[in-house]
From Swiss-Prot:
Residues 1-11 form the signal peptide. This is Complement receptor type 2. Belongs to the receptors of complement activation (RCA) family. Pfam families: Sushi. The gene is Cr2. Disruption phenotype: CR2-deficient mice fail to mount an inflammatory response when compared with wild-type mice.
Amino acid sequence: MLTWFLFYFSEISCDPPPEVKNARKPYYSLPIVPGTVLRYTCSPSYRLIGEKAIFCISENQVHATWDKAPPICESVNKTISCSDPIVPGGFMNKGSKAPFRHGDSVTFTCKANFTMKGSKTVWCQANEMWGPTALPVCESDFPLECPSLPTIHNGHHTGQHVDQFVAGLSVTYSCEPGYLLTGKKTIKCLSSGDWDGVIPTCKEAQCEHPGKFPNGQVKEPLSLQVGTTVYFSCNEGYQLQGQPSSQCVIVEQKAIWTKKPVCKEILCPPPPPVRNGSHTGSFSENVPYGSTVTYTCDPSPEKGVSFTLIGEKTINCTTGSQKTGIWSGPAPYCVLSTSAVLCLQPKIKRGQILSILKDSYSYNDTVAFSCEPGFTLKGNRSIRCNAHGTWEPPVPVCEKGCQAPPKIINGQKEDSYLLNFDPGTSIRYSCDPGYLLVGEDTIHCTPEGKWTPITPQCTVAECKPVGPHLFKRPQNQFIRTAVNSSCDEGFQLSESAYQLCQGTIPWFIEIRLCKEITCPPPPVIHNGTHTWSSSEDVPYGTVVTYMCYPGPEEGVKFKLIGEQTIHCTSDSRGRGSWSSPAPLCKLSLPAVQCTDVHVENGVKLTDNKAPYFYNDSVMFKCDDGYILSGSSQIRCKANNTWDPEKPLCKKEGCEPMRVHGLPDDSHIKLVKRTCQNGYQLTGYTYEKCQNAENGTWFKKIEVCTVILCQPPPKIANGGHTGMMAKHFLYGNEVSYECDEGFYLLGEKSLQCVNDSKGHGSWSGPPPQCLQSSPLTHCPDPEVKHGYKLNKTHSAFSHNDIVHFVCNQGFIMNGSHLIRCHTNNTWLPGVPTCIRKASLGCQSPSTIPNGNHTGGSIARFPPGMSVMYSCYQGFLMAGEARLICTHEGTWSQPPPFCKEVNCSFPEDTNGIQKGFQPGKTYRFGATVTLECEDGYTLEGSPQSQCQDDSQWNPPLALCKYRRWSTIPLICGISVGSALIILMSVGFCMILKHRESNYYTKTRPKEGALHLETREVYSIDPYNPAS
């Protein structure tokens, strides 16, 4: 545990205390100022050695240090003890008694007139020494002399000629030869007047008894004094190593024997091994002297073979003249007793035999093999001829691994991450969904390091549609994307449709759609018009013609500036745009000038001044007290006159008045007004006027107010859109709707109009909401770029169904079946036919040893074809013509070119010299043929391999030449008829044999009997091997 006290001494501090192993770490805080006390405690099972407390002190008020080293913690061991500690000039405190065990402490006190130096308390440590500090020293306050030292028997010391032994003087003892010093060699005179140690003694030196000598004997010595010699000898089976004697000598104050010899066991090397046999000894360890080893032969290795032991069956481990282990005799050997076993010479393709070549081999003969460059040996490199006349293990094979097989487009193969494959390995190919495998799905690696058969290909599978098109891209499905899609002129690529196709794995094809390019309505021009009358977008290619309006009056006309016709085309981004800006209609004016004009009692409101040109206008205002008579604005016409005539400012005045009754003789002037559309005449207002000319008179003015309709009629089982409105002005429209379960009969919408009297009224009677089904008549549905498969008439009744089909090159968006509903509409809506993008094919694959007519064309339109051809010396396998389909794929895989080879027939049916049946020759190779003796060459002796795998000229024949004496025999005249008959018969037989020399199978006439004289090639790229 830690107890600490803190006293503050400015900023002076001690370093962190050292850690004590196996002690609890004392607690402290920084800085550690002088006066801090740390106390250590040990962990359980450990004993504290030293003072438990250390103090942080500062002697010079500049630096602070710990007053002592920390204690140590040692594991408790009561078997350890320490000798009695002696401190000259001092004594142990009471309570300290021997024996002193591990962890015991002793505290010393100095005698009077002595001062202690060092730690007064020490502990018995695990090393049986007192510590952790040295024993204290009690120094005399008044130094004293030590007494004279006595002499010792058989020894002497360095102080024999010293008169006084003062404090600090040291004396060293030594012994006579043959004696050893016992005790402290050097003692020192202390200030207390005492020697710091006991006087040593000299004892006669003797060696210990040599004891027993392992595996040998010792000749007993007469004494054990220094100089005595002992002798050693070994038992049988052991050999003395070292000197045979040892002497007692003194080394470093000890009497010891010089190096003794040892008796090493005599061992024989491991017994010799015997081929085809064994022994009872060890094959790796040495064998002790006297051991016996027995040899036996191996059992019969195989049927018909046995081993016989030749020589001594047992041998013993003994010694020779050099006392080393040797065997009593040579090891026997086992001889094989075999019958006449022979193995035929083994054959290996693509390799050779490294051993001596023989026609046959004897039992246990071995043969080693190697392979041709580039091939690897599979199996054992060496084989043995066994007792059955066969080779074991089997003859190896030379084979070459295959490199990674080629990848296929739109497909994958097994183990695609591997780069090398062992012979015999098979790889399976498969195609992506939407593609079909053409060829074998599995290829195999041959020992020649080639893949066979040829790699398959994945061709585009024909999509067998399942269900309708989808206009939203399917998620997490395989989709065969459309490539090289394009649209006809006037269309641009837009969104895609997706068709589910039949297959083991669901897959889709993408169908790119074409959107018709349209332009916005042609621009409107001032003072002119154009030939397009609709407000909808304009189809691509449409031509619009512009025209100007006639002149506003005689002598004035509009002139067209710009292109009269523009057409709808497309910009660089494929968007619809007009071929050029719209033209302008500008007024063509004559040289017109109107005279200046003034109005008496009035002023001009416009700022322009004379001269005035065509269509210039002038506005007038009368002075106060005057009323304008005529138009306030006049215009300069093309004939240099003002229209209308200039007005007058007359002095007269009128003021509105409320009329309750007018005088009977009143002069009333009616001012007529024309009410605008949507307004009606509802009354009059009066103004009282007075002037000098007419006196007092009255102006009657018509008043126009807006036309209002009454709220529209309500209907049963329905309502209209104006239910919340308060007023219904002229032109307002309301729509009627029926409640659910009712249908509307009559006009759906009513409009606020004026009747014959000019009052507001609704455009017709309100409709009705009826519950029974009405008579249904749906309009004839029309689909652009499509047609109906049924119902060609124009009227359709309730529940009639129409089936639509899109034209070739278009795809349907919507349902192909629609039904006539009771509300005279089609459900679902009438579909639309969207143009499909036309697909193109990418450049077809190139083939080794051949080419095609596609050249550098990057994209091929549907229907275009390419032709493949092979180089000279190669034949085409497959179709030469490929056609680009509307699906954007080629009609079939490309062909390949295989090398042209000519060969001799396998079955020659005769004897030939140097002829190899089945050997092949490359295109262009020429062979020279020669017949064996007894045959005659018929045909050309030289033939060349042609590009159709045929020889030209055909290979020559060797005709058998035999029975050349037949005519002579047949020409002999014989007197006897019997002899003549026999001769004739014999001649017929020989003639028959000449023309038809038979074997057991067929005539040999016409068979090849050739030998190849030489082979050369005219093709520099295909030299004959």
